[in-house]
Curated annotation (Swiss-Prot):
Superkingdom of the organism of origin: Eukaryota
UniProt name for this protein: Glutamate dehydrogenase 2
Keyword terms, alphabetized: Mitochondrion, NAD, Oxidoreductase
Gene3D superfamilies reported in the protein's UniProt record: Leucine Dehydrogenase, chain A, domain 1, NAD(P)-binding Rossmann-like Domain
Active-site residues, record numbering mapped to chain: 102
GO BP field: amino acid metabolic process
Statement: the UniProt record of this protein carries the keyword NAD: yes
A Pfam cross-reference name: ELFV_dehydrog
Top enzyme class: oxidoreductase
Disulphide-bonded residues: none
């Protein structure tokens, strides 16, 4: 089952639990707008190459649409559609005044020079500039994009609309980015994990963690867990996987990866098969990489007691069912990785105010939002006798449905 089918399935389940009218259910499932554009650029050698770009604007009942732009060879309309829909529910779960969107270009950033990436980003912005905006649709970085990408979008958009720092988030600090934004998703994962563990009378200190993915999110999550006394016993990324039953020195591992670009040959742990990482012995498993990594083939062998979905859609529906029957507690992606979009909201607010917050304020506000959202999810779980995933979906879908009805859009 692909990401779109799984997302639609979760939405329909939440809709049935809430008893939504069929008209509003249909309205909430159909995207507001789907955009597909051709982006032709000259390569550094002068040859012309065309790429296909997408932007799906799913829903704006609760506010401007919000979501990342990813550069990846496997970007396709179904994936972008699913992720846009997830953003609608995610922003509602976090209770920030946004709807959902997502975008992407089917390209391999590693195969493009910096100047080629800039040209591609600017052409994409030229194609969609009149369909995004401060109060319309606010992009952000995602897989394969970063603060520099957002700077190019800001600059190109501003040529048409005047200086508009709030049109994108995840920007460099010097162009109106927020302090704390770089660590926000990983820090939010840790705040979410703390809220979950507290529900079971536990804390991060002394527990064992396995982290799949050592990019921005995985690195920050591992670093903060390490600082709070958690024992990270295994880590993987695209280059390989390592384990240490006594706990990995995360700061040393970060230095090693910064120096070598790889986890391989790190002397603070033993190499392991990446395929075995997800079934490694631990208290908490945190998938921070791609979707669909937990499936019916490996779910039965998972040994973790808790799974915190830092990645989007890491657990397919078959695995979800298997893990639930085993008693594994899953903290769903539409809540667990909402730290990034929450601090993006803080950045947008700061840009509109023309005022910059201290990093301590950003982190305290993030903790407040993540903790409050968890308790709201638990309330829905108790009300509807459902698991955390459906608690989060019913919370998000209900908020969007209410906004839709209040606007009179459901007819």
């Amino acid at each position: 089952m692909n990401a779109l089918a799984a997302t639609n399935r979760n939405f329909r389940h939440a809709s049935r639990i809430l008893g939504l009218d069929s008209k509003i259910e249909r309205s909430l499932m159909i995207p507001f707008r789907e955009i597909k554009v051709e982006c032709t650029i000259p390569k550094d050698d002068g040859t012309l190459v065309s790429y296909i770009g997408f932007r799906v604007q799913h829903d704006n009942a609760r506010g401007p649409m919000k979501g990342g732009i990813r550069y990846h060879p496997e970007v396709d309309p179904d994936e972008v559609n699913a992720l846009a829909q997830l953003m609608t529910w995610k922003t509602a779960v976090a209770d920030i005044p946004y709807g959902g969107a997502k975008g992407g270009i089917g390209c391999s950033p590693r195969d493009l020079s910096l100047s080629e990436l800039e040209r591609l980003t600017r052409v994409f912005t030229q194609k969609i500039h009149d369909l995004i905006g401060i109060h319309t649709d606010v992009p952000a970085p995602d897989m394969g994009t970063n603060a520099q990408t957002m700077a190019w979008i800001l600059d190109e958009y501003s040529k048409f609309h005047g200086h508009s720092p709030a049109v994108v988030t995840g920007k460099p600090i010097d162009l109106g980015g927020s302090l704390g934004r770089e660590a926000a998703t990983g820090r939010g994962v840790v705040f979410a994990t703390e809220a979950l563990l507290a529900e079971y009378g536990k804390s991060i200190q002394g527990l064992t963690f396995v982290i799949q993915g050592f990019g921005n999110v995985g690195t920050w999550a591992a670093k903060l867990i390490h600082e709070k006394g958690g024992k990270v016993v295994a880590v993987s990324d695209i280059t390989g996987a390592i384990r240490n039953p006594e706990g990995i020195d995360i700061n040393a591992l970060i230095k090693h990866k910064d120096a070598t670009g790889s986890l391989n040959d790190f002397n603070g742990g033993d190499a392991m098969n990446s395929d075995e990482l997800l079934i490694h012995e631990c208290d908490v498993l945190i998938p921070c990489a791609l979707g669909g990594v937990l499936n019916k083939e490996n779910a039965g062998d998972v040994k973790a007691k808790f799974i915190v979905e830092a990645a989007n859609h890491p657990t397919d529906p078959d695995a979800d069912e298997i893990l639930s029957k085993k008693g594994v507690i899953i903290l769903p992606d539409i809540y667990a990785n909402a730290g990034g979009v929450t601090v993006s909201y803080f950045e947008w607010v700061q840009n509109i105010q023309g005022f910059m917050w201290e990093e301590e304020k950003v982190n305290l506000e993030l903790q407040k939002y993540m903790t409050r959202a968890f308790h709201n999810i638990k309330t829905m779980c108790h009300t509807h006798s459902c698991n955390l995933r459906m608690g989060a979906f019913t919370l998000g879908v209900n908020r969007v449905a209410r906004a839709t009805q209040l606007r009179g859009w459901e007819a």
